[in-house]
């Protein structure tokens, strides 16, 4: 089996031969240089709001991805190959060993290729729509050692599935569950609505910050649990969580941050729009024996708006929005509710900067800014920012939204914003 990763034994640094073709890694310099690059970017974009702490590195910046998706194809010799889709394309890049993926994944994938050949299971071809196995999903818990394998097929028929499962588990006894997901159509690397458990319980469990979480095939869960534990610890500490503190966990996903807050004594309300994730959050709360946390399947902005109209109050808002950041409406409702602290967990430094600018104008100041290197060898930077309420001077008129800020919010909808004209007039053509 050809290796795709080269290790410099003098430094311990690894290099990937697929770097230019794959797209999984975006940075190829040494890890110390990567950290310096990310620190400079964080300081450049966020230092206007407060002191930016030193980025938190990963002790061993390899094999950190606990979620691994692999696609299959046949080469010119009709040999089954495995790999990933090229960045921003549907062309597959053959990869036998990835330095970012959990070490347990690659040997399992190699065995699956052998079984596909032996049992005449053809890889699915996106161009022709022929074949069966679309891709595999392998999820691993670094804390419990549990491993889930999901076989995603274009049809409900899986030839010799009992023999397939028996052979796979025999070769890899570390596998604790195998799930067959049926996805007859849809985009690459997506899951279908129907799943059948072939072996084990159909889920695995992971531990994070002293709490236990159930992970099913479609669960929302951070792909680097080692750094996630650090990230969430910073968030909980910044929030000043203690017994009796009222917390809103907006964009809560499967409830990870909120459950950790509740475990530390807070009274937590979680809000999540995705039904499946909200359902998982409730299961996770029960798994940890918590009765001081509740979850609502709702849009975070609308939920906050309803709270504001009722005159509700709480102490801390924890928000972990998607890459697009928070909506203007959400921020407006958050400010109206006026919590003492807002803890913003961000996966996009660009939208974080935009949102912090708005919070600042509304009387919130950053008291803590902590970047975390969640995804080594990529450009991604996660940040935890703690905002605290400061009274705005009574005689200060509210600042107007700039044209540039309007463009940030309106551009995705295809609307344009004209620049203001001096003296309030516009020349006719």
Q: For each predicted feature, which ranges?
A:
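Rossmann-like S-adenosyl-L-methionine
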Residues: 2-9, 160-162, 166-429
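Extended interfacial segments that mediate partner engagement and assembly in macromolecular machines
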Residues: 9-12, 20-123, 138, 142-143, ...
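Polybasic, low-complexity RNA-engagement segments
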Residues: 24, 90-99, 144, 153, ...
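A short catalytic or substrate-binding loop motif that flags glycine-/basic-rich loops and adjacent residues
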Residues: 60-65, 74-76, 128-130, 198, ...
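Nucleotide donor/acceptor-binding cores
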Residues: 66, 145-147, 244-245
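Short, acidic/hydrophobic/Gly-rich beta-strand patch recurrent on exposed beta strands
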Residues: 83-86, 150-152, 281
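Short helix/loop segment immediately N-terminal to the Walker
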Residues: 123-130, 247
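Short, aliphatic-rich beta-strand segments
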Residues: 138, 145-154, 212-216, 316
């Amino acid at each position: 089996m050809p290796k795709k990763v080269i290790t410099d034994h003098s430094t311990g640094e690894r290099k990937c031969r697929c770097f230019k073709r794959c797209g999984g890694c975006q940075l190829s310099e040494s890890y110390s240089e990567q950290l310096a690059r990310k620190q400079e970017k964080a300081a450049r974009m966020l230092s206007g709001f407060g002191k930016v702490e030193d980025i938190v590195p990963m002790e061993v910046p390899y094999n950190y991805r606990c979620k691994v998706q692999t696609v299959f194809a046949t080469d010119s010799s009709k040999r089954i190959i495995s790999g990933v889709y090229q960045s921003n394309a549907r062309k597959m890049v053959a990869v036998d060993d990835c330095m970012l993926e959990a070490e347990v994944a690659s040997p399992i994938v190699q065995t699956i290729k052998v079984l596909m050949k032996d049992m005449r299971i053809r890889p699915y071809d996106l161009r022709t729509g022929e074949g069966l196995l679309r891709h595999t999903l392998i999820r691993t818990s670094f804390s419990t050692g549990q491993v889930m394998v999901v076989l995603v097929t274009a049809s409900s028929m899986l030839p010799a599935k009992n023999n397939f499962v028996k052979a796979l588990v025999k070769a890899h006894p570390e596998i604790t569950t195998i799930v067959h997901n049926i996805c007859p159509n849809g985009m690459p690397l997506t899951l279908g609505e129907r799943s059948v458990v072939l072996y084990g319980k159909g889920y695995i469990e992971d531990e994070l910050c002293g709490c236990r979480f159930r992970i099913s095939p479609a669960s929302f869960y951070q792909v680097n649990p080692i750094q996630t534990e650090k990230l969430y610890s910073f968030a909980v500490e910044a929030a000043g969580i203690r017994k009796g503190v009222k917390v809103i966990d907006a964009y809560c996903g499967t409830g990870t941050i909120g459950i950790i807050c509740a475990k530390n004594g807070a009274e937590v309300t979680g809000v999540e729009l995705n039904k499946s994730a909200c359902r998982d959050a409730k299961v996770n709360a029960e798994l940890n024996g918590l009765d001081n946390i509740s979850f609502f399947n709702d849009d975070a902005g609308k939920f906050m708006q309803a709270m504001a109209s009722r005159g509700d109050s709480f102490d801390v808002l924890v928000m972990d929005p998607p890459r697009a950041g928070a909506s203007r409406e959400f921020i407006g409702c958050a400010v109206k509710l006026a919590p003492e602290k807002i803890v913003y967990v961000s996966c996009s430094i660009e939208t974080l900067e935009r949102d912090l600018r708005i919070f600042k104008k509304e009387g919130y100041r950053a008291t803590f800014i902590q970047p975390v290197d969640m995804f080594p060898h990529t450009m991604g930077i996660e940040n935890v920012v703690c905002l605290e309420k400061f009274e705005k001077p009574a005689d200060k008129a509210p600042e107007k939204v700039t044209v540039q800020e309007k463009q940030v919010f309106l551009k995705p909808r295809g609307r344009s914003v004209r620049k203001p004209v001096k003296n309030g007039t516009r020349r006719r053509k």
